[in-house]
Amino acid sequence: MKAYAKANIFLKLTGFDSRKYHLLESRFILLKDVFDELELVDKESDSKKEFEIISNFKCENNIIQKAYLLLSRRYNNELKELFSKKSLKLTKNIPVCAGLGGGSSDCASFLLLMNETLNLKLNLQELINLSIQLGSDIAFFLSGFNSANVSGCGEIIEEFEDDIPTLKWTFPQISCQTKAVYDEFDREIFDFQKNNNQAQIYKKLSTKELLQNFKNKELNDLFTPCATLYPKMKSYLQEDFFLSGSGSSVFKVDR
């Protein structure tokens, strides 16, 4: 099963919820040429792990393991039986700490794979309700939409009929820590009402129109704090690249 990456075309922060989590308004688009892969493979006879992930990257505290534990509260017997014979193979291609939602996409694909393999018969809303307990971007990947306006803490998804130009990507070898970038954003005083008003305009425009008519700093509130924390990102800010998420992946329209 393929776990596709995503890009944020705009990302506006509009306040906090009761848990002090950031509220956002964003346009997510699915990147179908950048993906991880998940599959079930036969378990090696000497493996003693109840749930084993075989991967080309370090898997400790992986969000998939958290999803397994969450599912096991309701489907413990089914999961134990499956993973007594199978391991999960995860081939990681999406850059890590790059603003492309790789971990969230992997988690969504794992939930979908378990729903299908174990015939759990969970509908989309039930899967989204589970995902809210795990992470903010997962709901978009569960939806299967190619483009959507995303709000709340990432759990409110509205499909958008979009016009998406070809994007040219650059993946800097810079590991941007999401929490650190958000913390840096919080050091500044922002007019959240103004941000929300801008977001309501952006939500009505196609991706093509957004990238043609607005500057990178206008579209993504996290670009300036990202460049402050990671000085090597400043050149991309100055050269009119657009930032996905909290970085470090950047892109331009391929002319």
From Swiss-Prot:
Catalyzes the phosphorylation of the position 2 hydroxy group of 4-diphosphocytidyl-2C-methyl-D-erythritol. Pathway: Isoprenoid biosynthesis; isopentenyl diphosphate biosynthesis via DXP pathway; isopentenyl diphosphate from 1-deoxy-D-xylulose 5-phosphate: step 3/6. GO terms for molecular function: 4-(cytidine 5'-diphospho)-2-C-methyl-D-erythritol kinase activity; ATP binding. InterPro entries: GHMP_kinase_C_sf (IPR036554), GHMP_kinase_N_dom (IPR006204), IspE (IPR004424), Ribosomal_Su5_D2-typ_SF (IPR020568), Ribsml_uS5_D2-typ_fold_subgr (IPR014721). This is 4-diphosphocytidyl-2-C-methyl-D-erythritol kinase. It holds the Pfam family GHMP_kinases_N. The keyword Nucleotide-binding applies. Gene3D superfamilies: 3.30.230.10, GHMP kinase, C-terminal domain. The keyword NADP does not apply. It comes from the Bacteria. Its EC number is 2.7.1.148. Keywords: ATP-binding, Isoprene biosynthesis, Kinase, Nucleotide-binding, Transferase. ATP binds at P95, V96, C97, A98, G99, L100, G101, G102, G103, S104, S105. NCBIfam families: ispE, PRK04181.1. It catalyses: 4-CDP-2-C-methyl-D-erythritol + ATP = 4-CDP-2-C-methyl-D-erythritol 2-phosphate + ADP + H(+). GO terms for biological process: isopentenyl diphosphate biosynthetic process, methylerythritol 4-phosphate pathway; terpenoid biosynthetic process. It is an enzyme of class 2 (transferase). The gene is ispE. HAMAP family: IspE.
